[in-house]
């Protein structure tokens, strides 16, 4: 029988940290992989040091730094660089956790909606708090596009408000759905290879096609791992730009 493709997303308790208000606080496999992701990022950014002639790890760290910095400058301007720590942390966390999830028998943190919602809400409340603290009531200009005829302005404002509060939904579901669907497809085709290979010589020939598809999907998932981190980060920059420059 083929392995359940959903089993890879199951959260399991490793040990109990304590109880708060009668509720158990558990350390799970998801928590472990989050800590592991942060540890890998710390190693990548801190261990290489600041050599005049950069090695491989230092080159990757510097390229990642400049990539995110240029992303912020192009979408939110130089003023947006004050949010560099937030955007860089989100980009690296999502990218590294996605890459870890591609390794067989590991856990994909971003395949759980609760994780992506938490990240999206972090961005959403950052935009709200900074937008009002910097602009005050002028932040509401975000919901009033310039050049809109007065007779349709109420409808446009209503649509703008709804779309603004739905941003965390689309921001989180996009990442969650892409990682979930990709890993399920990869697991299904890999299971086909295992089942056909177990049939003997005849099954080996039949396993060629699903094996090729599995390899192709793995390569695609490597691309998607970076692409989804980029999409999440670029949308974060766009939303932050709304807080920095609320006028359309």
UniProtKB/Swiss-Prot annotation:
PROSITE patterns the record matches: ATPASE_A
Recorded family membership: Belongs to the ATPase A chain family.
Protein role: Key component of the proton channel; it plays a direct role in the translocation of protons across the membrane.
PANTHER family: ATP SYNTHASE SUBUNIT A
NCBIfam families: ATP_synt_6_or_A, PRK05815.2-4
UniProt GO molecular function: proton-transporting ATP synthase activity, rotational mechanism
GO cellular component: plasma membrane; proton-transporting ATP synthase complex
Transmembrane domains' residue ranges: 27-47, 83-103, 113-133, 142-162, 192-212, 215-235
Membrane topology: Multi-pass membrane protein
Keyword entries, A-Z: ATP synthesis, Cell inner membrane, Cell membrane, CF(0), Hydrogen ion transport, Ion transport, Membrane, Transmembrane, Transmembrane helix, Transport
SUPFAM superfamilies registered for this protein in UniProt: F1F0 ATP synthase subunit A
Gene (UniProt): atpB
InterPro entries referenced in this protein's UniProt entry, alphabetically: ATP_synth_F0_asu, ATP_synth_F0_asu_AS, ATP_synth_F0_asu_bact/mt, F0_ATP_A_sf
Protein name: ATP synthase subunit a
């Amino acid at each position: 029988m083929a392995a359940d493709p959903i089993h890879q997303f199951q959260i399991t308790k490793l040990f109990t940290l304590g109880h708060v208000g009668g509720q158990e606080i558990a350390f799970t496999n998801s928590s472990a992989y989050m800590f592991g992701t942060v540890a890998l990022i710390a190693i990548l950014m801190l261990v290489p040091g600041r050599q005049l002639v950069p090695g491989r790890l230092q080159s990757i760290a510097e390229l990642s730094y400049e990539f995110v910095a240029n992303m912020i400058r192009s979408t939110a301007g130089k003023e947006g660089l004050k949010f560099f720590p937030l955007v860089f942390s989100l980009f690296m966390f999502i990218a590294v956790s996605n890459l870890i999830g591609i390794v067989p028998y590991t856990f994909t943190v971003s395949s759980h909606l609760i994780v992506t919602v938490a990240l999206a809400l972090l961005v959403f409340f950052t935009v709200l708090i900074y937008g009002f603290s910097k602009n005050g009531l002028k932040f509401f200009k975000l919901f009033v596009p310039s050049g809109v005829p007065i007779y349709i302005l109420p409808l446009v404002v209503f649509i703008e408000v709804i779309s603004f509060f739905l941003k965390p939904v689309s921001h989180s579901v996009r990442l969650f759905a892409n990682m979930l669907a990709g890993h399920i497809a990869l697991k299904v085709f890999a299971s086909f290879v295992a089942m056909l290979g177990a049939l003997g010589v005849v099954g080996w020939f039949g396993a060629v096609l699903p094996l090729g598809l599995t390899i192709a999907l793995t390569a695609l998932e490597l691309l998607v791992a970076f692409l989804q981190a980029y999409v999440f980060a670029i949308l974060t920059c766009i939303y932050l730009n709304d807080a920095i420059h609320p006028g359309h």
